[in-house]
Amino acid sequence: MFDIGWSELLVIGVVALIAIGPKELPGVLRMVGQWMGKARRMASEFQGQFQEAMREAEMADLKKSFDEVKEAASGFSPAGMMSSLQRDVDKALDIEGVDKPAEPVIATSPEPVASVETPVTPTTPEPPHAETFVEAEAHQAVGEPLAIVREIKPEPQPQPADGAAPAEPERLKDAKAS
């Protein structure tokens, strides 16, 4: 504690024996021991109070964080979620604003009105021509990946009894991968 070695303790003992004397030395040592005991008790009491304050502060922090979590979790109760969902559905089903006729709009802006002489250009695009449609399909088909499928080899089929020609077997070549 005070970093006193044996040699220093021996020097202190010899000085105390010479200064105090052998008759009163046991009483003085007892009194010094009591003071040391009181100092240790005070130090341990202070340390205990300090640790208690730290635990209380830590518990207050934990309680605060627990209260925050509890408050946040209270909004997630099934009844609370159902009531919020019910409110959303009620708002979606509210048709009072839909039934009212639209109010007439009065044009107060100083925008120039198109004259009758000005030809109006259509805003919708023309339908695609057959040539452009085929080109568009070909362009789209080039960009898509193809799946590799093996061709089905025709199996020998029995000849019909009436002498008709057999039907052409189906062949699968390239199929679009999708």
Curated annotation (Swiss-Prot):
GO terms for cellular component: TAT protein transport complex. The chain crosses the membrane at residues 1-21. Keywords: Cell inner membrane, Cell membrane, Membrane, Protein transport, Translocation, Transmembrane, Transmembrane helix, Transport. One of its GO terms (biological process) is protein transport by the Tat complex. Disulfide bonds: none annotated. One of its GO terms (molecular function) is protein transmembrane transporter activity. Residues 168-178 have a biased composition (Basic and acidic residues). It comes from the Bacteria. It is found in: Cell inner membrane. It is a single-pass membrane protein. Its main location: membrane. Part of the twin-arginine translocation (Tat) system that transports large folded proteins containing a characteristic twin-arginine motif in their signal peptide across membranes. Together with TatC, TatB is part of a receptor directly interacting with Tat signal peptides. TatB may form an oligomeric binding site that transiently accommodates folded Tat precursor proteins before their translocation. The Tat system comprises two distinct complexes: a TatABC complex, containing multiple copies of TatA, TatB and TatC subunits, and a separate TatA complex, containing only TatA subunits. Substrates initially bind to the TatABC complex, which probably triggers association of the separate TatA complex to form the active translocon. HAMAP family: TatB. This is Sec-independent protein translocase protein TatB.
